Amino acid sequence: MASEELASKLQRRLQWEEGDSGLQPAPGAAPDPEPQPQPPAWAPTARADAELSAQLNRRLDINEGAARPRRCKVFHPYSEFPEFSRRLIKDLESMFKLYDAGRDGFIDLMELKLMMEKLGAPQTHLGLKSMIKEVDEDFDGKLSFREFLLIFHKAAAGELQEDSGLMALAKLSEIDVALEGVKGAKDFFEAKVQALSCASKFEAELKAEQDERKREEEKRKVRQAAFRELKAAFSA
């Protein structure tokens, strides 16, 4: 009986040790590498949703005037302001760069203040802000070169009030732009109408000459056909 109990205890002891050895790694064996965390399957979708949400929020801000839209369009002054000569645009560009003290491609409020003082027409703070606002297409509170040209375009078209700061800028600039209509908008547009009238007259004369040549060609063909018929009649 005692031997059976001892054998039973030994058997249980062996089973217990074998169970522990199965849980422990073998001596000298390299430990299994820890599994790397896998990114959740919804991560790309979450990023796409975040980007779309950011785009929608920016569009809402632009529509509400809280953000400025990015301008990707390339500015071509000669095509956008065809009423100005290339020389005039070059002169206006030189003037713009002269007062762009920060060399950032814009004339800000302080630079505009200095410009108007040098031109002999100083403006109040509110007056300067009003000048910028009148041509500030992108609502950034400063003048780009395109907006600077727009001042002279509006002056030539008679779209500025005579006593406005922008009209003073256009009139007092050192550049002679009278021929372009800034100081004589009426003469400018009358000259433009006259040029269009001359062009229309030239086109009318050219068309009349073309019609006359067509009629002469038709008459010549009729005469040739009649001659061939007459010749055929005599040959018969």
Swiss-Prot record:
GO biological process, one term: regulation of cellular hyperosmotic salinity response
Domain EF-hand: 87-122, 123-158
Main localization of the protein described in the UniProt heading: mitochondrion
Annotated Pfam families: EF-hand_7
Composition bias type Pro residues, residue spans: 28-42
UniProt xrefs under PANTHER family: EF-HAND DOMAIN-CONTAINING PROTEIN D, EF-HAND DOMAIN-CONTAINING PROTEIN D1
UniProt-annotated location(s): Mitochondrion inner membrane
Region of interest called Disordered, as start-end residue ranges on this chain: 1-48
Record gene name: EFHD1
Entries under InterPro entries matching the protein: EF-hand-dom_pair, EF_hand_dom, EFHD1/2
Official protein name in the record: EF-hand domain-containing protein D1
Keyword annotations of the record: Calcium, Membrane, Metal-binding, Mitochondrion, Mitochondrion inner membrane, Repeat
GO molecular function: calcium ion binding; calcium ion sensor activity
SUPFAM superfamilies (UniProt xref): EF-hand
Residues that, per the record, bind Ca(2+) 1: D100, D104, E111
Keyword rRNA-binding listed: no
Record function comment: Acts as a calcium sensor for mitochondrial flash (mitoflash) activation, an event characterized by stochastic bursts of superoxide production. May play a role in neuronal differentiation.
Binding site for Ca(2+) 2: D136, D138, D140, K142, E147
PROSITE patterns membership: EF_HAND_2
Record's keyword annotation contains Membrane: yes
GO annotations of cellular component type: mitochondrial inner membrane
CDD domains attached to this UniProt entry: EFh
Annotated Gene3D superfamilies: EF-hand
